[in-house]
Each structure stands twice: as C-alpha cells, then as structure tokens.
Regions:
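Long, contiguous binding/interaction regions
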Residues: 1-81
Length: 81
C-alpha cells in the first residue's frame, strides 16, 4: 500500500489524556519515523510532533482518534509526494 510522509502536531492541555494518546501512538509505532515532545511548564501544556510514513487513511484515522481526546488539539500536514 502506498504511504505518505506527514507531520502530526499535538498540543495536550489535559494530562489525563496522555496515557490514551500514547496507547494510540504505540499502535502505529511501525509507521512512526520519530517523535519529539516538549513540555511547556509555564503554560501547563505539552507540545508533541510526530513524523510518520503511513497510508494516508491510517494517518488520518490516528489523527482523528487523538483529536477526540479531551483537552487535545491535533493538526496533520502531509508532504506533497
């Protein structure tokens, strides 16, 4: 199946959602190229960037599931190729 490279940017404002988010990311681990998390303690949020190379349907589904978590905002950007 054809894959597309994408960057999923996640902002977590509710720490209680982190465990479920990590479980969703673990399920997609075979497609994840890399992950960077930045705790922004002054604002009480976490900023996470995920580089992924997966079928577009899987990336979209993952992004949607993460975005439905309470206190979590997500945006996905796809490479042109």
């Amino acid at each position: 199946m054809e894959t597309r490279v994408a960057c999923i940017t996640i902002i977590v404002e509710n720490a209680e959602s982190v465990e479920k988010m990590n479980s969703l990311l673990h399920d997609a681990a075979q497609y994840i190229i890399g992950r960077m998390g930045i705790p922004y303690r002054e604002k009480g949020i976490n900023i996470i960037s995920i580089a992924i190379d997966a079928p577009q349907d899987l990336t979209s589904e993952l992004s949607g599931k993460i975005g439905r978590l309470e206190g979590v905002t997500v945006k996905t950007t796809y490479a042109n190729h």
